[in-house]
């Protein structure tokens, strides 16, 4: 059994925030693979799903981002899932928009959801890093991640979540390299291989106007 966690903040106020792309991806996995309805469990919302031949629990912690580890730890202990079978989907500032990378363990790169999980559960879980790009200035990061995706970003966000869901059985089977490659090819096929952040797009537009 796998525990697949999407990170985000609960409530409509945060629903389309960049910080919530983990929730969005898990919702799309649930939709594409016809998961059971989400129910309130483990200080979050949880649903069972079959991904290929693998049974998985989808989890969206409702503790707010900084306390995500409480929800993850509760679910992990209940199902006796090894930390190596915990997969966390989260927004990644240090990855270009529309890119995806999978890694095992490593640092938290300032992500409070990952920091909480690492503190309460350990570090050796798998992370699916969903690139949202960086606003260009550290002082802008807080506002950037807690703002909604721009309308111009919505198409690639939807396509990234769909590609993640379509190939989630590979992820559940532990075929991380194949999963990552399939998502990359799907996104490139839709023209998303060189996406700019809104700030980068604005600068490029200004340069073109001069």
Swiss-Prot record:
Localization: Cytoplasm
Site (Stabilizes the basic form of H active site to accept a proton) location in chain: 91
UniProt keyword Transferase, yes or no: no
Active site: 19
Catalytic activity: an N-acyl-L-alpha-aminoacyl-tRNA + H2O = an N-acyl-L-amino acid + a tRNA + H(+)
An example molecular function term from Gene Ontology annotations: peptidyl-tRNA hydrolase activity
Annotated keywords: Cytoplasm, Hydrolase, RNA-binding, tRNA-binding
Alphabetized Pfam families for the sequence: Pept_tRNA_hydro (PF01195)
Leading EC class: hydrolase
GO biological process: protein quality control for misfolded or incompletely synthesized proteins; rescue of stalled ribosome
Entry binding sites for tRNA: 14, 64, 66, 112
This protein's GO CC annotations: cytoplasm
NCBIfam families the UniProt entry points to: pth
Similarity comment text for this entry: Belongs to the PTH family.
Quaternary assembly: Monomer.
PANTHER family: PEPTIDYL-TRNA HYDROLASE (PTHR17224:SF1)
UniProt-recorded name of the protein: Peptidyl-tRNA hydrolase
Phylogenetic lineage: Bacteria, Pseudomonadati, Pseudomonadota, Alphaproteobacteria, Hyphomicrobiales
Gene: pth
